[in-house]
Protein backbone atom coordinates (compact mmCIF):
# COMPACT_ATOMS: atom_id res chain seq x y z
CA UNK A 1 0.00 0.00 0.00
CA UNK A 2 1.44 3.37 -0.98
CA UNK A 3 1.56 6.07 1.65
CA UNK A 4 -0.79 8.98 1.00
CA UNK A 5 0.87 12.33 0.31
CA UNK A 6 -1.52 13.74 2.93
CA UNK A 7 -0.47 11.24 5.62
CA UNK A 8 1.84 11.68 8.58
CA UNK A 9 3.26 9.33 11.20
CA UNK A 10 1.37 8.94 14.50
CA UNK A 11 2.39 7.01 17.61
CA UNK A 12 -0.02 6.50 20.51
CA UNK A 13 1.78 5.44 23.66
CA UNK A 14 0.66 4.47 27.18
CA UNK A 15 2.96 3.67 30.11
CA UNK A 16 2.31 -0.02 29.39
CA UNK A 17 2.62 -0.26 25.60
CA UNK A 18 2.75 1.22 22.14
CA UNK A 19 -0.98 1.21 21.31
CA UNK A 20 -0.76 2.46 17.71
CA UNK A 21 1.97 3.32 15.23
CA UNK A 22 1.09 4.15 11.65
CA UNK A 23 0.18 6.63 8.95
CA UNK A 24 -2.88 8.85 9.40
CA UNK A 25 -4.35 11.75 7.45
CA UNK A 26 -6.16 13.37 10.40
CA UNK A 27 -6.42 13.18 14.18
CA UNK A 28 -9.18 14.79 16.23
CA UNK A 29 -8.32 14.93 19.93
CA UNK A 30 -9.92 16.35 23.12
CA UNK A 31 -7.77 19.31 24.20
CA UNK A 32 -8.35 21.09 27.49
CA UNK A 33 -10.09 23.93 25.62
CA UNK A 34 -12.05 21.69 23.24
CA UNK A 35 -11.53 19.41 20.28
CA UNK A 36 -8.72 20.11 17.85
CA UNK A 37 -7.71 18.55 14.53
CA UNK A 38 -4.20 17.80 13.28
CA UNK A 39 -3.36 17.23 9.61
CA UNK A 40 -0.07 16.93 7.71
CA UNK A 41 1.95 20.13 7.76
CA UNK A 42 0.56 21.37 11.09
CA UNK A 43 2.76 23.83 12.97
CA UNK A 44 4.75 22.39 15.89
CA UNK A 45 2.45 21.91 18.87
CA UNK A 46 2.43 20.60 22.42
CA UNK A 47 -1.07 20.31 23.90
CA UNK A 48 -2.53 18.88 27.09
CA UNK A 49 -5.42 16.45 26.57
CA UNK A 50 -8.44 15.71 28.72
CA UNK A 51 -10.21 12.37 28.85
CA UNK A 52 -12.37 11.77 25.80
CA UNK A 53 -12.68 10.33 22.32
CA UNK A 54 -9.84 10.41 19.76
CA UNK A 55 -10.75 9.94 16.09
CA UNK A 56 -8.26 8.85 13.45
CA UNK A 57 -8.59 9.01 9.67
CA UNK A 58 -6.15 6.38 8.43
CA UNK A 59 -4.15 6.62 5.22
CA UNK A 60 -6.19 3.74 3.71
CA UNK A 61 -9.29 5.97 4.07
CA UNK A 62 -10.71 3.94 6.98
CA UNK A 63 -11.49 5.50 10.36
CA UNK A 64 -10.94 4.43 13.96
CA UNK A 65 -11.80 5.90 17.35
CA UNK A 66 -11.10 5.13 20.99
CA UNK A 67 -11.24 6.66 24.47
CA UNK A 68 -8.19 8.12 26.21
CA UNK A 69 -7.60 9.08 29.84
CA UNK A 70 -5.93 12.47 29.43
CA UNK A 71 -2.36 13.02 28.32
CA UNK A 72 -0.29 15.10 25.93
CA UNK A 73 -0.11 15.53 22.15
CA UNK A 74 3.07 16.64 20.37
CA UNK A 75 3.47 17.55 16.70
CA UNK A 76 6.95 18.10 15.30
CA UNK A 77 7.83 17.95 11.63
CA UNK A 78 5.89 15.17 9.91
CA UNK A 79 5.34 13.16 13.11
CA UNK A 80 2.89 13.27 16.01
CA UNK A 81 2.96 11.51 19.37
CA UNK A 82 -0.02 11.08 21.68
CA UNK A 83 0.95 10.11 25.23
CA UNK A 84 -1.91 8.95 27.46
CA UNK A 85 -2.41 7.20 30.79
CA UNK A 86 -4.82 4.66 29.29
CA UNK A 87 -6.65 3.93 26.05
CA UNK A 88 -9.65 1.71 25.29
UniProtKB/Swiss-Prot annotation:
InterPro entries: ATP_synth_F1_dsu/esu (IPR001469), ATP_synth_F1_dsu/esu_N (IPR020546), ATPsynth_dsu/esu_N (IPR036771). The keyword Flavoprotein does not apply. It is a peripheral membrane protein. Gene3D superfamilies: F0F1 ATP synthase delta/epsilon subunit, N-terminal. Its main location: membrane. Keywords: ATP synthesis, Cell inner membrane, Cell membrane, CF(1), Hydrogen ion transport, Ion transport, Membrane, Transport. NCBIfam families: ATP_synt_epsi (TIGR01216). F-type ATPases have 2 components, CF(1) - the catalytic core - and CF(0) - the membrane proton channel. CF(1) has five subunits: alpha(3), beta(3), gamma(1), delta(1), epsilon(1). CF(0) has three main subunits: a, b and c. Produces ATP from ADP in the presence of a proton gradient across the membrane. Belongs to the ATPase epsilon chain family. This is ATP synthase epsilon chain.
